[in-house]
Amino acid sequence: DLTHEDKMIRKYQRKLNRQKYMSNNYKKTLQKYYKWLNRKNNKIQNAYHQLSKYIVKNYDIIAMEDLNIKGMFKNKRWAPKLQKISLYKLVQMIKYKSKWYEKTFIQINRFYPSSQICSECGYQKHDLTIDIREWTCPSCKTKHNRDINAAKNILQKALQEL
């Protein structure tokens, strides 16, 4: 939880704005501001390292989709949420840690229609838009959650590539 760090960063930003530029008090406040900024960044880095280590240590095969992060930033709804996290950094950590621990890391192409393909029968529903979160396969009548179905398909694709 980074609420305390965010609160302190905002506090020192306001304080810096009120002080005379490059005065002694300004320099002291600037040091405190950077201290809290570093503390926040260290907590984030630590969380990424813990998560990536957990994933790599507990799974022998790690399959991830190569996400179009630049395209996600163009979406007005997702951009503010994505600015707070660094998916690229997390993926890079998982990649190099999987080499350290001699685990298999497979990255699936971003254009693979993982959420459009039924994980039960293989039917591909082409008219599936991004706002549809659940859908029923017309072929086998299986009800799918978009994200869970995509995860199953990514795993199947990774196992095929082995």
Residue ranges and their predicted role:
Residues D1-L162:
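Positively charged, helix-rich recognition surfaces that bind polyanionic ligands
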